[in-house]
């Protein structure tokens, strides 16, 4: 339990460790190295190469997670807390989303582009606000609920391996000519691992507007985990959230102050999750 409490305290008080010593950054560099050194071939070979890349990255994550077992006291305790903290990002997510609140549209586009994969160069203010809030909702699962869910189930290996899978999906899990087959295995694995956490995230939104959250949840695409927390956030805020030509949850037009409202919802949801985690560890 000390490990979880200290890791949460580190995150809330200090935020992220420097990139040069951040395990998730290491995962990203390893993925980028493998990706850049593999020349695409046939679909079958690309799929096998992607499978191999996934196994390499997950093996690295697992080896990192067991380092504390072989470290001397008290380094083992410090390593455990440090590695667990690196698997989730409560404060960092809050700060990144808050920085998108810019009066100047061009500045806002730049900030939003840092937290979403879509092209923001031609998005209007309402769609920029929507994209910012969508990212907050989706990453409430990916960066907070899911890694700590797998920590609760499998300890430090669960948290770091999940984070490695999520990083793989974020980097190569796209349906493009380059990644369609190379990223398929890691994308499907990410879908499987996020199935339960995404729905747990929705349950955390439920007390804020039960009837509407349930109604919006039913609108979300069944097979797409990321839709679920976005639908829940849209329901609670009462605004439309939209990725053009992909999905749209109904409501009034989003306004700048809705980002602030979304951040308050995020604080409530994360607080609920932390409380449940601590109760789970105690019991």
Curated annotation (Swiss-Prot):
Pathway: Cofactor biosynthesis; adenosylcobalamin biosynthesis
GO biological process, one term: cobalamin biosynthetic process
GO MF term set: ABC-type vitamin B12 transporter activity; threonine-phosphate decarboxylase activity
Compartmental location: Cell membrane
Keyword check for Membrane: yes
Keywords, comma-separated and alphabetical: Cell membrane, Cobalamin biosynthesis, Membrane, Transmembrane, Transmembrane helix
InterPro entries xref list: Cobalamin_biosynth_CobD/CbiB
Entry keyword Transmembrane: yes
Ranges in a coiled coil: none
This protein's GO CC annotations: plasma membrane
Transmembrane portions of the chain: 5-25, 47-67, 142-162, 263-283
Protein topology in the membrane: Multi-pass membrane protein
PANTHER family: COBALAMIN BIOSYNTHESIS PROTEIN CBIB
Role according to the record: Converts cobyric acid to cobinamide by the addition of aminopropanol on the F carboxylic group.
Entry similarity comment: Belongs to the CobD/CbiB family.
Name used for this protein in its record: Probable cobalamin biosynthesis protein CobD
Annotated organism of origin: Pyrococcus horikoshii (strain ATCC 700860 / DSM 12428 / JCM 9974 / NBRC 100139 / OT-3)
Lineage, broadest ranks: Archaea, Methanobacteriati, Methanobacteriota, Thermococci, Thermococcales
């Amino acid at each position: 339990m000390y490990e979880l409490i200290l890791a949460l305290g580190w995150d809330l008080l200090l935020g992220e460790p420097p990139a040069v010593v951040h395990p998730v950054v290491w995962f990203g560099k390893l993925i980028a190295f493998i990706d850049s050194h593999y020349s695409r071939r046939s679909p079958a070979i690309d799929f096998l190469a992607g499978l191999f890349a996934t196994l390499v990255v997950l093996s690295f994550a697992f080896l990192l997670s067991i380092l504390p077992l072989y470290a001397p006291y008290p380094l083992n305790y410090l390593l455990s807390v440090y590695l667990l903290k690196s698997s989730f990002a409560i404060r960092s997510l809050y700060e990144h989303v808050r920085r998108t609140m810019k009066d100047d549209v061009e500045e806002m586009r730049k900030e939003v582009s840092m937290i979403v994969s879509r092209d923001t160069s031609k998005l209007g203010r309402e769609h920029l606000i929507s994209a910012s809030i969508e990212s907050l909702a989706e990453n409430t699962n990916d960066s907070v609920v899911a890694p700590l869910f797998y920590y609760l189930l499998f300890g430090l290996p669960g948290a770091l391996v999940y984070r490695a899978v999520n990083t793989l999906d974020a980097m190569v899990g796209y349906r493009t000519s380059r990644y369609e087959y190379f990223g398929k295995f890691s994308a499907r694995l990410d879908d499987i691992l996020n199935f339960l956490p995404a729905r747990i995230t929705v349950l955390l939104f439920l007390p804020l507007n039960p009837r509407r959250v349930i109604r919006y949840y039913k609108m979300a695409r069944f097979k797409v985990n990321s839709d679920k927390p976005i639908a829940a956030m849209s329901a609670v805020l009462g605004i439309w959230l939209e990725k053009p030509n992909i999905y749209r949850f109904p409501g009034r037009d989003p306004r700048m102050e809705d980002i602030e409202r979304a951040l308050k919802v995020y604080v409530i949801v994360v607080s609920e999750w932390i409380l449940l985690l601590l109760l789970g560890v105690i019991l």
